[in-house]
Regions:
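Amphipathic alpha-helical packing segments from all-alpha helical-bundle domains
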Residues: 110, 123-151, 167
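Amphipathic alpha-helical segments used for helix-helix packing
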Residues: 66, 71-72, 104-131
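C-terminal peripheral helix-coil segments that are non-catalytic and often amphipathic
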Residues: 1-13, 143-150, 167, 172, ...
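Short amphipathic alpha-helical segment with a characteristic S/N-K-E followed by hydrophobic residues
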Residues: 25, 40, 63-68, 78-79, ...
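Basic, helix-initiating cap at the start of DNA-binding domains
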Residues: 1-49, 55, 66
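Hydrophobic alpha-helical connector segments
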Residues: 80-109, 162
């Protein structure tokens, strides 16, 4: 998985980073966000919950936006993987089920919805969400395609990389699951995940063979 780097470009210098402290801070951030909401969350409250000094947070994050986005991103980095289940269809079904289960966790759902709501009027936050959460998970598309090509399920690439194609595949998978779980509040069970996987396998063949 891609390493998580929660600091901003102007990170202050200080003592060496502690992975344990980072994990505690990010977990405390998600907990506080679920209880207090975006407007009620403060770095002081997060520091108290994590058992660290508030200055520790300011050495790592420029402010609340950066901290909350990285707290959400950490869940995806730690929990979301593309399983190798022997076929492209099975791999897609597996990652869909894992993604849905992750989104259905109260801490994920609350934190992600808070980020999205706040980002509707904060362009910088929206860009940070894209960079820290969305773009970092697009490697799952690349991994799945390489596996499928090695199995002979998809043809090898015959030209330069096509980021637009990868974005389309990612958007179809992620958008379908996010809408199902967080908008329509419908279950993502084995049957639904299988139907989506079958649809995607047919569509992927068209994407790879089309213009």
């Amino acid at each position: 998985m891609c390493p998580l780097s929660p600091a901003s470009h102007n990170r202050r210098t200080g003592r060496p980073r502690s992975a344990d402290a980072d994990r505690a801070i990010l977990a405390a951030t998600r907990e506080a966000l679920a209880e207090l909401g975006w407007s009620g969350l403060t770095l002081g409250d997060v520091a108290a919950r994590a058992g660290v000094a508030k200055t520790t947070l300011y050495r790592r994050w420029a402010g609340k936006n950066e901290l909350v986005v990285d707290a959400v991103a950490a869940l995806f980095e730690e929990q979301l993987e593309l399983p190798d289940l022997g076929s492209l269809q099975a791999d897609i079904q597996g990652v869909v089920l894992r993604f849905a289960a992750l989104l259905d966790r109260p801490e994920t759902k609350t934190a992600l919805m808070a980020c999205i709501a706040e980002a509707t009027h904060d362009d910088a936050l929206r860009l940070r969400i894209r960079d820290a959460i969305v773009d970092r998970q697009k490697h799952l598309v690349l991994t799945g395609r390489v596996r499928a090509q090695q199995r002979g399920e998809l043809p090898p690439d015959d030209g330069p990389a096509d980021p637009a194609r990868d974005d389309l595949i990612f958007d179809v998978v992620a958008g379908s699951v996010v809408h199902r779980v967080m908008v329509s509040s419908q279950p993502v069970d084995d049957a639904w995940a299988l139907r989506l996987a079958r649809l995607l396998v047919v569509g992927l063949a068209g994407v790879h063979n089309g213009p």
